[in-house]
Amino acid sequence: MTTQLNINSVIENAKRVITPLSPISIFAARNPWEGLEADTFEDVAKWLRDVRDVDIFPNKALIESAVARGELDESVFNQLVTDMLLEHHYNIPQHYINLYIDNIKTLKDVPASYMNHSNVDVVADLLLEKSKRDMAESYHHYDVRPMSDAIIDEQGEPLSEQVNRQMIKWTKLYIDQFLSSWTMPKREQSFYHAWLHLAQHDHSFTKAQRQVIKGLPNDPEMTIESVLTYFSIDQEDYQAYVEGHLLALPGWAGMLYYRSQQHHFEQHLLTDYLAIRLVVEQLLVGDEFKSVTKDCESRSENWFKQTVASLCYYSDMPSDVLLQHDVNEIQTFIHFAATMNKNVFKNLWLIAWEMTYESQLKQKIKAGHESVAGALDVNQVNVSENDNANQPHSVLLNDTQAVDENNSELNQVGTSTKAQIAFCIDVRSEPFRRHIEAAGPFETIGIAGFFGLPIQKDAVDEQFKHDSLPVMVPPAYRIKEFADRYDMNVYRQQQQTMSSMFYTFKLMKNNVMPSLLLPELSGPFLSLSTIVNSIMPRKSRASLQKIKQKWLKKPETKLTIDREFDRTSDLPVGFTEQEQIDFALQALKLMDLTEAFAPFVVLAGHASHSHNNPHHASLECGACGGASSGFNAKLLAMICNRPNVRQGLKQSGVYIPETTVFAAAEHHTSTDTLAWVYVPDTLSALALDAYESLNDAMPMISEQANRERLDKLPTIGRVNHPVEEAQRFASDWSEVRPEWGLAKNASFIIGRRQLTKGIDLEGRTFLHNYDWRKDKDGKLLNTIISGPALVAQWINLQYYASTVAPHFYGSGNKATQTVTSGVGVMQGNASDLMYGLSWQSVMAADRTMYHSPIRLLVVIQAPDYVVARLFANNEHFARKVSNHWLRLMSVNEEGRFKSWI
């Protein structure tokens, strides 16, 4: 029992290095470093470079591209370098420092000739002898890397590659989502026991190795303990050793981690995986591990050689000149080169990039308010740099935005406003909202796309239930979609007919004899389909939709809003009346919509349409767990239209006029159209007028939004018909980039719409409505930070990781991806499960960057004390800021910006 507790504790702690990965069909953005945020971004970057040779700073090409495009101000970087040098004093000649800085800041690599120079070896040996004890302690973490990493096989590759191939084979077999005709025997017992049963007959192992497998314990914890003991790993090093194995295939390990969270019977899945992996490593390594030295001297020597070579190259100091100094002077030089290494400068370039964006964002807001002030002929806008030394990046805005609490203009909707449309905070909504507001008397609002409803949806046209809320929160309720019994029976029969056709096709494909006949039967049809889809993608897609509407038309449905008893459900079905009131009130507060209602209020979720795209879920709503958010929008709109709910809201101080009607729609981000999901049968005269006005304006809005969006896609030539071109992108089965998704996301603004209204934020900003004056206890802000802002940060860091380290955190080229086991994609037929974004999602071309890899900038419109209170109440968020996993800026009641560094 003691062994089991110890091993389970080790694995529980080691899981911090990977992240749970959902299947690609419900792809949800994940922060790959969420479990590591107790350390600073810089420390994690150093650790990953040491243990996996993964660099998570933007490389030289990305930095140069940012400078060329005006996204990175070199003067900001130079000032950061100057400030850093002022903080340190080095007792070496200044001209060496100047030369070193001028060269290393270009991020050019040290030529191999410098590393191989004999004098470099002499200096390294000299320093190693003097610092052996200290350096051995510094490099202790190298000792506990997997043994298979240190042993090279006959083909010249680490044995860990053979271990990986074995684990890919077995993990694919276990995790298969019922795509294969035969499932893994005994998988219902556990992954480990199924492997034990099958591996005894696997002739990729030798006869002696299979005998070892037969004698393994039935307990995976005991197996892990046995292998670690065999390799003479000290107990204090267990976690580091296990972490090395989890990081070897973080995709497959992450998928198993996800499944262990979803199913109680698979809660020890990572333990099974590690037991199998360690056994495979032991079988392949054998006694060779004894030749792997635990002495750190060779690695310390290599570190000294690299540092000496860097010093000589960047400072233009010949190595023989360095040798003319005594050992203490040489140590001073080495200390300088070590503390001013290339990764320090990569970090400074990244910070300068982020500071440049922060400055540009403030300038946009400043210019927007100057324009508004001039147009309205109101009091002069005083824009001046803040001379407070403690706030070096502040700017003062005294305009219509910097008003006192008694000014009611910010709390009242304009008398001519016909409709208020609440969009998801998704960055793709920002341009669409801007064009809607410019098209007529419409007001837009930002809120997370799940609309504050912690639900699991059970839709009639979806095979599986889906958790329609942020992935870090478990659902608390189940909402079922249903229709009249007759309509449902007809629809189910149609579904079964379609399913039978696909199942028959699959059955023929997966069986020996029928598969020989299948090409003859299906070849002509599939060939014709391929030709038509290639030549006329938009028309073929439209025809397919018409056929689907005719033969598989979804009936008019209702939702189980009221609480129902269902003994088969593990979650409450529907809401009580008080819960409906509470969720409606919470959502309206999060939208900052508790008064001055327009006649027509639209709750707009969003969805994306693309064809032949395994990563389609990555373009859906991140706040709904990688699915469209129209379901949540419809549910909340129906709740808000209920008389008993409105009466309950009235008792809470929120009065919705009888003439105000709530409706639901979906913003299709790939075509910038608004599709109605739910419109009540009866509309008031004012609501009907608003509904018609919005529909009339939508064609122009779509054309303008599509033109703006398509101009950013690497299309060929000028787009003359943006709406048709957008539809072609969404319909073309060969299109690798139907839309940019959330690429270039950079900031999250929490504040009143007046702060950013009319300002072109280039589709880079998440926008969430918030009025600190109505949030007396700070709970609303804490909710926004803990939910929507966290989702945005995860999205931001996934795009960041997929850009700076695509080989490790991305998913490669779409054209060479292989969908495997129904859960994800690989490159080829035996790679790690590629769990990030594809190359085409972040790059405009092979050598042309599109996404800007900078950490999310959160902007809060509130006084300093509100932000300070947030830090006190939300230690998790405070840690993210202090450890540099995101940046924070606020704008207070005087209109003064402050960077919280």
From Swiss-Prot:
GO terms for molecular function: zinc ion binding. Disulfide bonds: none annotated. Pfam families: DabA. Its cofactor is Zn(2+). Its main location: membrane. It comes from the Bacteria. Belongs to the inorganic carbon transporter (TC 9.A.2) DabA family. HAMAP family: DabA (MF_01871). Part of an energy-coupled inorganic carbon pump. This is Probable inorganic carbon transporter subunit DabA. It comes from Staphylococcus aureus (strain JH9). The gene is dabA.
